[in-house]
């Protein structure tokens, strides 16, 4: 892989540090009046998702990570693994609970997901930004109860719990932002 110097770090770049892949989320190059220039970089560890801030001297470098993002279709969960398929080659790939993380509650059959591979193994799964799910349990709302900014918890068909407006009822389908886990709108 290519070698990147600290002044080449940009958001989205994937590099290797301490034998693990990291994604650059933000980078600020600083040239102080006195002393050597440096880069202040915010990184996300791809194996665990934890965020780290590091400082690199202008002469520091890092290897590019051999990480591939693939668009795959979610097929099913067998209890231990989540199975995905490449729509072009029909090749199937299995991801474990560590790679799925908290995203399992947003996975729907036939949903297009971004699966990140490192050394041919899935290390993270990103669901679609928005999903449409049915409400299976929530407190009943009262007619005309639309005032105020309050909400109520609602359990969705995948088991996820989302705060919804008071007028939303059981059986309705809602649109949810998977990045924040927030209610967006009702689906007609």
From Swiss-Prot:
It comes from the Bacteria. Keywords: Cytoplasm, Elongation factor, Hydroxylation, Protein biosynthesis. InterPro entries: Elong-fact-P_C (IPR015365), NA-bd_OB-fold (IPR012340), Rib_uL2_dom2 (IPR014722), Transl_elong_fac_P/YeiP (IPR020599), Transl_elong_KOW-like (IPR013185), Transl_elong_P/YeiP_cen (IPR001059), Transl_elong_P/YeiP_CS (IPR013852), Transl_elongation_fac_P (IPR011768). The keyword Cytoplasm applies. CDD domains: S1_EF-P_repeat_1, S1_EF-P_repeat_2. The modification N6-(3,6-diaminohexanoyl)-5-hydroxylysine is found at residue 34. PROSITE patterns: EFP (PS01275). It is found in: Cytoplasm. Pathway: Protein biosynthesis; polypeptide chain elongation. The keyword Cytoplasm applies. One of its GO terms (cellular component) is cytoplasm. Pfam families: EFP (PF01132), EFP_N (PF08207), Elong-fact-P_C (PF09285). Is beta-lysylated on the epsilon-amino group of Lys-34 by the combined action of EpmA and EpmB, and then hydroxylated on the C5 position of the same residue by EpmC. Lysylation is critical for the stimulatory effect of EF-P on peptide-bond formation. The lysylation moiety would extend toward the peptidyltransferase center and stabilize the terminal 3-CCA end of the tRNA. The hydroxylation of the C5 position on Lys-34 would allow additional potential stabilizing hydrogen-bond interactions with the P-tRNA. Disruption phenotype: Disruption of this gene leads to lethality or to a very slow growth phenotype. Required for the expression of poly-Pro-containing proteins. Changing residue 31 to A: No lysylation. Belongs to the elongation factor P family. Binds 30S, 50S and 70S ribosomes, possibly near the A site, note that T.thermophilus structures show binding between the P and E sites (PDB 3HUW and 3HUY). Proportionally less EF-P binds to larger polysomes, suggesting it has a role early in translation. It is present in 1 copy per 10 ribosomes. Involved in peptide bond synthesis. Alleviates ribosome stalling that occurs when 3 or more consecutive Pro residues or the sequence PPG is present in a protein, possibly by augmenting the peptidyl transferase activity of the ribosome. Beta-lysylation at Lys-34 is required for alleviation. The Pro codons and their context do not affect activity; only consecutive Pro residues (not another amino acid) are affected by EF-P. This is Elongation factor P. The gene is efp.
């Amino acid at each position: 892989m290519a070698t990147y110097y600290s002044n080449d770090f940009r958001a989205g770049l994937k590099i290797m540090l301490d034998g693990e892949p990291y994604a650059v989320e933000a980078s600020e190059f600083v040239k102080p009046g006195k002393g050597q220039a440096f880069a202040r970089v915010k990184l996300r560890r791809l194996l665990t998702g934890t965020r780290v801030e590091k400082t690199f001297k202008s002469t520091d470098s890092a290897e590019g990570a051999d990480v591939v993002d693939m668009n795959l279709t979610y097929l099913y969960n067998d209890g231990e693994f989540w199975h995905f398929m490449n729509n072009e080659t029909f090749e199937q790939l299995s991801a474990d609970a560590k790679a799925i993380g908290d995203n399992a509650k947003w996975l729907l059959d036939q949903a297009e997901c971004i699966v990140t591979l490192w050394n041919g193994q899935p290390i993270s799964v990103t669901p679609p930004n928005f999903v449409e799910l049915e409400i299976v349990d929530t407190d009943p709302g009262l007619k005309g109860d639309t005032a105020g900014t309050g909400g109520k918890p609602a359990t969705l068909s995948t088991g996820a719990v989302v705060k919804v407006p008071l007028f939303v009822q059981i059986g309705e389908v809602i649109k949810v932002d998977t990045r924040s886990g927030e209610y967006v709108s009702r689906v007609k």
